[in-house]
C-alpha cells in the first residue's frame, strides 16, 4: 500500500507562529512515517500558500534536514511564502477547485492542511465539499 502524501499551505499574514505550526506538522508527519511508512508519505508545502497548489509549485519538505525543519520554530515570516488569495465559493469558482483536485490527485495527496484565518477556513470547507462531491478522498484540516 502506497503512503498518502500531505499538502500544507500558509495563508494570510506570515508570522513566526505559522512557521512553528509548519515545523510541528512536518515533524509529526515524519514521526508517523517512521512508525508506519504506509501511513503518511511526503509533506508538500505550497509556495505562496494555496497559489502553490494552483500553480503546481510544491516544495518537497522531505528534501530538508530534520535540523532545518526544527529551525522553522525560530524563523520569522512565512518560510514557504503566503498569500491572501481568496478561492471564493465553490458555486462561482468551480474551475479553481477542480484544478486543486487535479494537482492533489497527481501527487497522491490525501491530507490538506491550511494555516490561516477565516478566509482559509472557508476555502478549506469549500474544498472538502468539492472533494466529497467528486468522490476523491481528502482529509482537510
Language model regions located:
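Alpha-helical scaffold segments in soluble metabolic enzymes
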Residues: 20, 24-28, 42, 71, ...
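N-terminal phosphate-binding or glycine-rich loops at protein starts, especially the Walker A/P-loop
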Residues: 1-57
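General beta-strand structural signal in soluble alpha/beta enzymes
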Residues: 42-47, 80-82, 114-116, 123, ...
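Short, ordered loop/turn segments at secondary-structure junctions
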Residues: 11-13, 46-51, 84-85, 117-119, ...
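Short, acidic/small-residue loops that bind anionic groups at enzyme active sites
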Residues: 128-141
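A short, small-residue-rich loop immediately preceding and capping a beta-strand
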Residues: 5-11, 110-119
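Glycine-rich oxoanion-binding loops at beta->alpha junctions
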Residues: 55-112, 119-121
Amino acid at each position: 500500500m502506497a503512503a498518502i502524501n500531505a499538502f500544507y499551505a500558509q495563508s494570510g499574514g506570515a508570522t513566526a507562529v505559522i512557521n512553528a505550526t509548519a515545523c510541528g506538522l512536518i515533524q509529526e508527519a515524519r514521526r508517523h512515517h517512521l512508525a508506519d511508512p504506509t501511513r503518511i508519505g511526503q509533506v508538500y508545502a505550497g509556495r505562496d500558500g494555496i497559489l502553490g497548489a494552483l500553480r503546481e509549485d510544491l516544495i518537497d519538505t522531505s528534501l530538508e534536514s530534520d535540523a532545518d525543519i526544527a529551525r522553522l520554530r525560530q524563523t520569522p515570516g512565512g518560510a514557504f511564502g503566503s498569500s491572501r488569495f481568496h478561492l471564493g465559493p465553490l458555486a462561482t469558482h468551480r474551475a479553481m477547485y477542480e484544478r486543486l483536485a487535479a494537482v492533489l490527485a497527481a501527487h497522491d495527496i490525501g491530507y490538506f492542511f491550511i494555516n490561516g484565518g477565516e478566509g482559509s477556513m472557508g476555502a478549506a470547507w469549500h474544498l472538502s465539499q468539492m472533494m466529497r462531491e467528486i468522490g476523491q478522498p481528502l482529509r482537510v484540516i
